[in-house]
Amino acid sequence: MSRKSLIAGNWKMNLNHFEAIALVQKIAFSLPDKYYDKVDVTVLPPFTDLRSVQTLVDGDKLRLTYGAQDLSQHDLGAYTGDISGAFLAKLGCSFVLVGHSERRTYHDEGDALVAAKTAAALKNSLTPIVCIGEYLEIREVGEHVSHCQNQLRGSLAGLSPEQIGNVVIVYEPVWAIGTGRVASAADAQEVCEAIRKELGALASPQVAETVRVLYGGSLNAKNIGDIVAQQDVDGGLVGGASLDGAQFATLAVIAAGGPLP
């Protein structure tokens, strides 16, 4: 089955709302409309930028989409500092990151919470981009595949096969996040193939063939082509390179199969 590539830009805690507008304008200028037929492009700004991005995307009728970097497992109530998926949906978000390694590491988010947030995203018609991945010490002892499959099961616990079909999965080896190190194309394929196999066990092989599985970790114009060319890699979650509009657009063009404009 042919799955449309997805390139998602995770801005992390960078850029105020003025800077966000400038970056989205740069991406739109650098990425001609014809490429959107082959690749979906989304940006994931900080919460405080979302309204400005929405106004620009809607006003200029841009084809890229946008989403958030996290959400609450709750819809409403006395949860100080939380952001509801219902609020994100009202802002026109299409996607939301769930379980990024930085949330798991710095905020102690475990698989059960990730599963609850994933369910909350789906409840509010948001597409959750669920992140899983291993630390270097796990890879070095050869347990990276089983670790990722276990993490996937925990992060999707309680979801129906139909719900699983509406999720995007990201394999982000923690040792490659912001380090400049990157998994080889073969490394990415090995784990993404195992993820798809596990999705087949959790839902069905048919559902697994429809789910987009991305790679994340120090992606750039030199390495993304080989990685997204792998059979089970359907795009990328881009970190630092997503803060440069021209570079991010180039990654999207490569994921679309080129040629560069």
From Swiss-Prot:
GO molecular function, one term: triose-phosphate isomerase activity
Active site positions: H100, E172
Pathway(s): Carbohydrate biosynthesis; gluconeogenesis; Carbohydrate degradation; glycolysis; D-glyceraldehyde 3-phosphate from glycerone phosphate: step 1/1
Binding site for substrate: N10, W11, K12, G178, S218, G239, G240
UniProt keyword list: Cytoplasm, Gluconeogenesis, Glycolysis, Isomerase
GO cellular component: cytosol
UniProt catalytic activity: D-glyceraldehyde 3-phosphate = dihydroxyacetone phosphate
Swiss-Prot/TrEMBL GO biological process terms: gluconeogenesis; glyceraldehyde-3-phosphate biosynthetic process; glycerol catabolic process; glycolytic process
UniProt-annotated location(s): Cytoplasm
Keyword Ribonucleoprotein: no
Location, primary (coarse class): cytoplasm
Membrane-spanning residues: none
Keyword Lyase appears in the UniProt entry: no
EC number: 5.3.1.1
Assigned protein family: Belongs to the triosephosphate isomerase family.
Subunit text: Homodimer.
Function in brief: Involved in the gluconeogenesis. Catalyzes stereospecifically the conversion of dihydroxyacetone phosphate (DHAP) to D-glyceraldehyde-3-phosphate (G3P).
Protein name: Triosephosphate isomerase
Native species: Mycobacterium leprae (strain TN)
Gene symbol of the encoding locus: tpiA
